[in-house]
Amino acid sequence: MSKRFSFIALAVLTLITSSQAQEKRGRIRDFGIQIGILPTGTNNAITDVAGVTVGQKTLIQGDQIRTGVTAILPHSGNIFQEKVPAAIYVGNGFGKLMGISQIEELGNIETPILLTNTLNAPKVADGLIDYMLALPGNEQVRSVNSVVGETNDGGLNDIRGRHVSSKDVLEAIQAAKSGPVQEGNVGAGTGTECLGYKGGIGTSSRKLPTSRGGYTVGVLVQTNFGGVLQINGAPVGRELGNYYMQEPKEAHKVDGSCMIIIATDAPLSARNLERLAKRSYIAFGNVGSFSSNGSGDYSIAFSTNTKNRIPHQSDKPVFDQEDLGNDFMSPLFMAVWEATEEAILNSMFMATDMTGINGRTVKALPIQQTLKILQKYNALDYDKLPKAIQK
């Protein structure tokens, strides 16, 4: 056997062994874990809200580049010309979210929502503006409020290199589609960490019963924060021996950030969308986070309801818009809590081990160990319990 053939055979064997060592990954429902009592949408994703699409560009190059961009489009038209109602809730403001002040002032968004890493946010905004100015119908546009969220992936990525380009932004937007959404180490979640393990992109949705409006709520998260991991009340992080304040010399990464994007087809004003966005943080506490000092935690909610779109130009001084009554908001509040919590957990269950800058490795959550812990605390098989009304 030649030396060259021996080297190739050894490399293939190493690759196979490494692949076998990686646990089978999947979404939490694939392993019998259920959050809440409401049913999911068809794909259990933010794209279950009609018209919403998601596109991603992942950058994994050499030993140091572990980053990307994720694009969420509220509808398939020109969003600058047909804006949608929106609101932002700030859980902890240690972040660089772009576009926030105009959204708070006017209550709408006029671009797709893009997610990336902290130092790339201005470059991504630049690419997003290029995209918007080039859209047919925007030839006279001289002001664009680009919406770009971020988390700091510098633990695995050469963040100072600012590797996401305008071309990557355009490719992510052009790749946007409905249906299932990639999760884990993809797009803006490529280099993120969550609750002591590899984080990433996660998504989930909830469908309300007809008697409660029949509306859909979809959530997409970019997880990059710390704490003490809990799943359905089970102390998973403590059982695994990986949690915040475990030891005097802190190894657990507690700072980071989380971006939460919420879509719904319910007819909501910016006021009620902010109320909806607030409830997403119930999920934060449920999974064991507390919005640390250095965590930039933002929730952006928008409504796709076509009756509430805001034309960029109109001769009408008064708009006819619908807003769900306050007394009918509670089912949506529950839906956003459930979907956010499941999206966070999906981001971790779908993530895989990653080695990045300076040879640093972040392990994925060990699923089989986690399932044993959940079994120990009777936190599995919730699908056998009574659920919400179906009609």
Give each language-model segment a name.
Residues M1-Q22:
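Bacterial Sec-dependent N-terminal signal peptides
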Residues Q22-K391:
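Alpha/propeptide regions of enzymes that mature by internal proteolysis
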